[in-house]
Each structure stands twice: as structure tokens, then as C-alpha cells.
């Protein structure tokens, strides 16, 4: 609704895309507001598409910084999570103002092998003159690689000039995906000259004498652990030498969901899963304690035990943990057995991100899943 603002959307004029593509904020009266995003294109023809996109994560141009640019721009480490995840739904309303038929696809781009962008398209939607359509697309599996762009591709089988209006685009739903180190970096020692991502990683342990690609999947997580290593199949080797450390990712919109992970405890005093995280001082946690306790905790600028039960803990054992949130009811499962549940009746956290927590030691996990 802000005049002149394009909300971060940009025209992609790279490769063989249509160079005569322009976008602007325009007046458009509808049930939801008075503005829309207008995309004008000239000389659209077969094989030459008009594309526009918005960044949803670490911008691609940052991966191409030279050393001097890095020193100027990356004074602070990049901290942020993607805004789009596999399994979520994209909903959008598009109005064609073109006198010939056009075809429109939604697409995403994710960081894959070599930190290069890989593209996934939706099905094709045909628009005739002055046609309005509401379309939906479920984001496909990106194999644990972070999504960094969301966009539209406009095509035609014949030469045409015209415009479309995007009334809205909405991202909704809980992801259905597994977070882990992507398979293409199982052996992640690779020479690269594109950029030195080591300088962009905060709290991520990478040996100084080696240069790695494929660290962008870790940048999708916010963390305050002392070290995070990912050797072999272990995606999440989290070390906090003193006090509590976390890694988390996701969106503040996520409400009712479950998180699962098989976790091994190595001399940690406590560790487990985090749900509905709204920051380092606001979250729920399911934690196994070295004192033979299982807890559901609430961190609200101070740790509060919502429920505690006895639990026979063995160090260096793997435990399959599942933590569920359904409105204000919280349930904790160990090895698929419901062992603890509680209702938070006071100032409950209604939504938030997912993650892991470790206290005074190390925990290890191959992957974390949400659905």
C-alpha cells in the first residue's frame, strides 16, 4: 500500500531474459487494498521470457564479493533465516492486461552444489486477455538447500507487449521438510575462487587451512553456540562450553507443528528441541537432563519448568525426540513414546521458529524435521 514501493521485487535481466521488462507500484482498487505491482513488458516472444523475483534469503550478489567489498560490506556477520521453505504454499492473484495469451509460472531458486543457484518452476498457468486468476503452488523439496529467490516468469508463443498486475502474494502453511547438511557437501572439501564464505559465518567452525564451499545452508540458521561442526553425516554438532546455546531457523508465523530429531548427548548437562522460538529469551524446549529428568521448559526472559518427569538418561546414547505444539498444548515423545505433556495457561507463545538447544557440553544430530 506504499506508493512507489516495489517491496524488494526486481527484474531479472540476466541470461536470455527479456531486457524490456519494467515494474512499478500502481493504483488498483480491490477487496484487500488500493495498490498492486505492475509488470510491463515489450517484445515478449517465444524463448525470451520476462522474469521478476524477490530475495528470500542471502542475496546471490553477496557470494560474488571480492576481498575489498567483503571488508566494506561484511563488517558484521550475516544473521537471518529464509522466508520460504519446502512444503509451504504460495498463493497469488494475477490480472492480465495483455491482448494476447500469455503463460505464467512461479519459481524458486535455491543454493545447491557449489553455492550456485538452481531453479524449480511451478506448472504453467495460461492467461487470456483481461483474465484474473488466483493460483496456488506448493513449494517442492529442495533437498535441504535454502531457498533464496521467489519469482514469476512470463512467457508467450508469439510476440506480444503488455502488462500484468500482481494484487498479492502470500506464503502460508507449515513446512514439510528435513533440515540437514545437503548431500552434495557430504565431502565438503572443495577448492573455490568465487568467494570465501568463512568470513560470513558466525559461530561455524571451519579449519583455517582449508577453504570450503557449501556453507550457505548453515547461514539459514541463527546460532549462539560456541562451535558448530558438521563432519561426515553429522549435520548438527553443537558445542556450548558454558551456559545454554541454541540454533534456530524458520518464521514467526509457524503455529501448530511437530519437530523431530535423533540426538546423541556427549557430556552435556541438558539438550533437546526448541519450538515456537521468538528469540534467545522466548521459546519452549523439550530437554533431557543429565540429572535423569525430562522437562518441558518455557524461556521467557528466565527459565521456567512447565513440567518435569523422571527419565533414565545414558550419555552417548541416541534418543529420538519429538516435540509437538497444538495451540497451547505441548507434548514430548522419546523413542516414539509420549512421556510428558503440559498445557501452558499463562501468556503462551502462539507461534515461532524451530531449533536445538545444548547446555554445558555437546549434542550431535544428523537432521531435524518439521511437519
Residue ranges: model-predicted function:
Residues 1-93, 97-100, 114-119, 124-134, ...:
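Extracellular glycan-recognition regions
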Residues 105-110:
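Short, surface-exposed beta-strand/strand-loop-strand elements in extracellular ectodomains
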